[in-house]
Amino acid sequence: MERIKELRDLMSQSRTREILTKTTVDHMAIIKKYTSGRQEKNPALRMKWMMAMKYPITADKRIMEMIPERNEQGQTLWSKTNDAGSDRVMVSPLAVTWWNRNGPTTSTAHYPKVYKTYFEKVERLKHGTFGPVHFRNQVKIRRRVDINPGHADLSAKEAQDVIMEVVFPNEVGARILTSESQLTITKEKKEELQNCKIAPLMVAYMLERELVRKTRFLPVAGGTSSVYIEVLHLTQGTCWEQMYTPGGEVRNDDVDQSLIIAARNIVRRATVSADPLASLLEMCHSTQIGGIRMVDILRQNPTEEQAVDICKAAMGLRISSSFSFGGFTFKRTSGSSIKREEEVLTGNLQTLKIRVHEGYEEFTMVGRRATAILRKATRRLIQLIVSGRDEQSIAEAIIVAMVFSQEDCMIKAVRGDLNFVNRANQRLNPMHQLLRHFQKDAKVLFQNWGIEPIDNVMGMIGILPDMTPNTEMSLRGIRISKMGVDEYSSTERVVVSIDRFLRVRDQRGNVLLSPEEVSETQGTEKLTITYSSSMMWEINGPESVLVNTYQWIIRNWEMIKIQWSQEPTMLYNKMEFEPFQSLVPKAARGQYSGFVRTLFQQMRDVLGTFDTVQIIKLLPFAAAPPEQSRMQFSSLTVNVRGSGMRILVRGNSPVFNYNKATKRLTVLGKDAGSLTEDPDEGTAGVESAVLRGFLILGKEDKRYGPALSINELSNLAKGEKANVLIGQGDVVLVMKRKRDSSILTDSQTATKRIRMAIN
């Protein structure tokens, strides 16, 4: 009060008022502050007083020829006075308005091309749908997200080379454009930007946006793909969220999504093959996603997902050092442990050998729908703080943490035997056995865990064994928090090794990933995934396997033909026949195989000639391990379209139909390719394939006319006789059988009788 009174007294004196309002500020420090350096110290004030002047802008003298002195309203646009200290003219803000309305226009053709990312963003927002705003507590966790929709996935260095080549093609400096994507983009952009008048630097900035993935570590609740991140400020606040559906998709999100689906399919398929690692690599190298080789995408794309990381590890690429268990990403934040094998007894008195982590450790656990902080000692959970979207997600996190803790009460909670197997029918390791068991039913686990009274801590509540929240009691060591746990922010990548069963280890030997961790979620890929590997034929069902198998035989017929006659065993063991076996009824596989192999052997025996179409048709059946039996078949069954369909050993069927006239094969009505038969095959002597169904009567008999060729022979009526030229230029007399006999006896007797007839 005293001070205010004093001030009032001072202000009542006219001298005080005069000093404060009239005198100039000549304090050196203040003058220095506002005049040193080029940087404007008070831009807002500067702008205000500049705009209050009549001519606040300076322009090149040429402007006087380009702009009239006065506008339509008669207002002056520029002053004849020169700008002090330069030879520029003083110009009014009205001149800018005049220029914008009446000034020269330039072609706008390049704007949508250069500012592509912005134009596309506007379109997405125009077609997007904003829903209602909900007020609720937002559990946000920081995740590394892509903030730049619509980009290619070039590394900074690759992009730099492309930009230099497109924008400054004449600059010196070595630029090596090696990758397919670099070359395609460069060509495309050079064409698009011919005669572009936009400042090169601007073009370069915009190209960078299009070529490089930019990521930020941002707090997110909800969608993490780039088309959601670009509207993050509109869709979630501290206590509210607004529903939003993007008005378009962008290729980079589609690539990420399709890559995950392809990787999961490949890992799942590799797991069940004889050599998982070799199969996985073969599939990664022969798969394309949206027309780009999967291995190229893996090298450039930073997506971290279990299956994707297994594929990267197999290719020798570095991956994140965090490990995966139960679908959660674990990152150790402090402590250390040594690992020791220990035998434990389950509640069912089954012995399990587990690798115990001895020592105190702290981890963050991050999943899709829940996150947690875990503190544990040797086989003991000390504390678990969980936050999640809903009860179910929180329960999932608790189960994973309880199993990971390796506590005795968890192992004793097992009821019944643990015998979970993976896709290849191999038993899972003990930790995954326990995990699967409790994921199926965790009632006993929660019941036996124990509960404790809790202190009232801000933002934390308890959770009971039936997964209901509670403020008084909670499962021992476990609390629910409103706050999420941030994802591990570092982008550090480490060198890893992978064994043939696709287990990925860091350099200390800790398992980071294994196929058990790959999600079973099925999705539909946004981009076309083309699996060229035969191992992936079955992904589109049995029909695809059938068609692909026959297409493969026809495409590679030249090679197969030679192998068929010279080293059949190698041919039968080809992996391309593996998928086909799943179509053949289990009980019949061995018998069919034995039958077809014997048949083929007889074809080889009879003067080394054969029937192309029949070999192609029956070849896939010979791949199974054969059973020795005298069984004869006139048709072989394959399981497609939900039932058994028959392939006739002789002749066409809906499954396998060869059109002699067009030489085209259709499998289940789908074209499987055309056969270029050997030119001499039609006119050659009889081959064993045709002798089936004919009885050899003896040496040539002139009464039955000149010797027929193979094609003419097929026109005989049942019971009719004819002379036939066989392979080595010999002629024998045959009769077409009156009934369809067993094929094998024909071939066997034919072989013997030809020898007799000739000798």
Curated annotation (Swiss-Prot):
Gene3D superfamilies recorded: Polymerase Basic Protein 2, C-terminal domain
InterPro entries: Flu_PB2_2nd, Flu_PB2_6th, Flu_PB2_C, Flu_PB2_CAP-bd, Flu_PB2_middle, Flu_PB2_N, INV_PB2, PB2_helical
Site, as annotated: Avian adaptation: 627
Primary localisation category: virion
Domain of life: Viruses
MF (Gene Ontology): RNA binding; RNA-directed RNA polymerase activity
Assembly notes: Influenza RNA polymerase is composed of three subunits: PB1, PB2 and PA. Interacts (via N-terminus) with PB1 (via C-terminus). Interacts with nucleoprotein NP (via N-terminus).
Record-given protein name: Polymerase basic protein 2
